UniProtKB/Swiss-Prot annotation:
Family: Belongs to the bacterial ribosomal protein bL36 family.
GO biological processes: translation
GO cellular component, one term: ribosome
PROSITE patterns: RIBOSOMAL_L36 (PS00828)
Record's protein name: Large ribosomal subunit protein bL36
Protein's UniProt keywords contain Nucleotide-binding: no
Pfam families: Ribosomal_L36
UniProt keyword terms in alphabetical order: Ribonucleoprotein, Ribosomal protein
Protein's organism: Bifidobacterium adolescentis (strain ATCC 15703 / DSM 20083 / NCTC 11814 / E194a)
């Protein structure tokens, strides 16, 4: 899980979602998991 000030989609499988007021990226590739923090 990468925590960065700006989250971006890395590949076409990445999905940007909001969970509990946090913007997150979930993907089939676990290395692409990101959270805005």
């Amino acid at each position: 899980m990468k925590v960065s000030p700006s989250v971006k989609r890395i590949c076409e499988n990445c999905r940007v979602i909001r969970r509990h007021g946090r913007v997150m990226v979930i993907c089939v590739n676990p290395r692409h998991k990101q959270r805005q923090g």
